[in-house]
Amino acid sequence: MTDGILGKAATMEIPIHGNGEARQLPEDDGLEQDLQQVMVSGPNLNETSIVSGGYGGSGDGLIPTGSGRHPSHSTTPSGPGDEVARGIAGEKFDIVKKWGINTYKCTKQLLSERFGRGSRTVDLELELQIELLRETKRKYESVLQLGRALTAHLYSLLQTQHALGDAFADLSQKSPELQEEFGYNAETQKLLCKNGETLLGAVNFFVSSINTLVTKTMEDTLMTVKQYEAARLEYDAYRTDLEELSLGPRDAGTRGRLESAQATFQAHRDKYEKLRGDVAIKLKFLEENKIKVMHKQLLLFHNAVSAYFAGNQKQLEQTLQQFNIKLRPPGAEKPSWLEEQ
């Protein structure tokens, strides 16, 4: 059966231009990524080496000088080490063989789906939720990028206001005729710096929470989605293989292969259904967690920004207390991990 499969693979036609280069199809980029994902699960053979060649063979045979008519051949008996090496080599060969067959079947199924010659299992509701998650993640990544830009601008503004306040304070000491004017401008800049530091703390907390939601929670769910999609491809590949065997002639050899294909198909079906259930559960919990986190963070962001631009220092400080945000004093070092526990 394997020889037949490899024979088909060897005769696959690839469209070629007149200049000898393979023709690029519109979906080549996506297809290449999918093929890389299929090939990435190859076996790791670096732990032990595969032993090849003869086992227990003799070196240079010694023929004794005597009256014997028949020369005696020196042979080295196989030791325990040779048996272990044979076992390791056999296991590695089986791993490579199974991986090669699985990769071929999945690649064949992927190409059949891409070129419209094969069928695929589709859970419309689940795939819609997965696509919605990917779109939501892209939008949240955009919000995260803008939030980081706002943090950088606020920090730069604080540095400028602090320097301007120091300059006004210095000039108030050196210009008696303008001492009062420079003085209250210096106090204004200092107050703006204090409120700005409070706002910066709130925005940093907002950005940190969004970052955790995007890079940890959403990414964890998408990793399970990738496992589900790989299991779906394997399930369809072995389903197609079973259907082709079922349509063939029924003899003693075919019945054995059919039973083996049925068992393999059932194993991949169980794996696919389990991962489909895992994805559905993670999507549900992710949605609940996202709503809970964003409700809190959007309220914090609104209250802090509104209080800052209204010049309401008391409300700004109350906002940070409401969300248990503690500001580090200027120049303070970051606490150690032990202090944060």
UniProtKB/Swiss-Prot annotation:
Residues that bear Phosphoserine: 72
Any coiled-coil regions, as ranges: none
Keywords: Autophagy, Golgi apparatus, Membrane, Phosphoprotein
Cited Pfam families: Arfaptin
Phosphothreonine: modified positions: 76
Cleaved signal peptide residues: none
AH domain boundaries: 121-321
CC per GO annotation: cell cortex; cytoplasm; cytosol; Golgi apparatus; nucleolus; plasma membrane; ruffle; trans-Golgi network membrane
PROSITE patterns: AH
GO annotation, biological process: actin cytoskeleton organization; intracellular protein transport; lamellipodium assembly; mitophagy; protein localization to phagophore assembly site; regulation of Arp2/3 complex-mediated actin nucleation; ruffle organization; small GTPase-mediated signal transduction
Region (Disordered): 46-85
Name of the protein in question: Arfaptin-2
Source organism (scientific name): Homo sapiens (Human)
Underlying gene: ARFIP2
